[in-house]
Amino acid sequence: MITDIVGYSKLSGDNQDVALELLKEHDKILFDLHDKYNGNILKNRGDGVISAFNSSSDCIRCAVEIQRKLKRRNALNIKERNLNIRIGIHYGEYVKDGNEIHGECINFASILEPLAPHGGIAISEQLADIVDKKNDIYI
């Protein structure tokens, strides 16, 4: 899973205090839900994370709950304080080399992430097929 806060660079340039507040909220939500779904945050990229899960179903459930939680959070805030993220998900093996993470799954998820709408999730067709065959998540 790769996540990215939409518009974070502009926000941090416009109002660094608000940007840091939103980043703290973002981190709390993502870290708590990764714990709940047994996700492992491999790298915190500042305005997003790269993470891995033992189960693709858990990864997708985590992503859905992240977006639901953010949608509820945004409904209670003014537009300028909305926190929207995009999520890209693929599956496969990766290699962690110090602070760097390599692998086709990382590359593909990073291509998918910007294709997701604000507050959305983009998953690869291959992953959708795998999860669909398990019949435990409707995509």
Task: Give residue spans per PLM region.
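Catalytic NTP-binding/metal-coordinating core of nucleotidyl cyclase/transferase enzymes
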Residues: 1-62, 69
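Catalytic beta-strand-to-alpha-helix segment of the class III nucleotidyl cyclase homology domain
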Residues: 28-31, 50-139
